[in-house]
Amino acid sequence: LIVVGTDDGLVRISRDNGRSWDKHENFPGVPQKAYVTDVITSKHDLNTIYVSFNYHKYGDFKPYLVVTKDGGKSWKSISSNIAENDFVWTIVEDHINPNVLFVGTEFGMYFSMDTGSSWRKFKKVPTIPIRDLEIHEEEDDLVAASFGRGFYIVDDYSPLREYSKPIESKVAHLFSVKSTYQYIVAAPEKTATGHNFFSSPNPPYGVKLSYYLGNNVQSKFEERQRVESNKFKRGEIIDYPTAEKLEAEAKEKTPKIYLTITDSEGDVVRRISSSKNKGYHENYWDLRTFSQRNVSEENNYSGPLVPPGKYSVH
């Protein structure tokens, strides 16, 4: 199967190594002669093809993104909730989960977990054109090439494959953890290249731990502040807390979130303090056990490396 797109809005498909071609020129909602910016075939289904279009040279900055699941017999728009003025440059499909898609647009990047029915924008990507996307399949990294701002890498996006609407309704969810290698981190000196020396930070050493919290983990005092703030915004009367409530707030310990690492025997080898805010979070375990220093909440130092083996996180 060979699929090509042209600069005048055509998509041509060949099933005989280029000896003959089917022409496709009508796509739902896409203007005639729109520039085809990208064409990809699915890694999971021979009849599934994704095409993105660009019509900004005619003053139309809308995103145009379509898919066929029957080899081109019918096409469906999957632009859905991509911003109206954020036209699409490129699209890639996850190599393991066909529901996961990524697009690069004029103002950033989006991802979908439902084959384009809905999209979410990456929040920490600069507002710049993302002209090309590539997936490093061995590491599950997403590499983005921007126009004028270099390359950006999303390290190990594999939790997105597991992410779903039911997870958002849970109190908490811990995503699957990948195996990793243990090694001694080197600290080489810079070479004599002066101002030409450039390096980009690697992911932290160790195992990435990803989790989702359905709500902020709050103390009684923080919860009362939230309720009172909402009442103030609505113009409602705010009752002064009773002495019993104030005493309970004062005695309560500040709630914390810890990721607990255990070995194959169930013994705890490390606890890692993590964010207690609502949403998706990442943390790293550096493959070391507890510090040998005096125990305290402020002591976040690590101890010696743990022996290779099977470990769990809770």
Labelled PLM ranges:
Residues 44, 126, 202, 252, ...:
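Surface-exposed coil/turn segments at beta-strand junctions on protein surfaces, enriched
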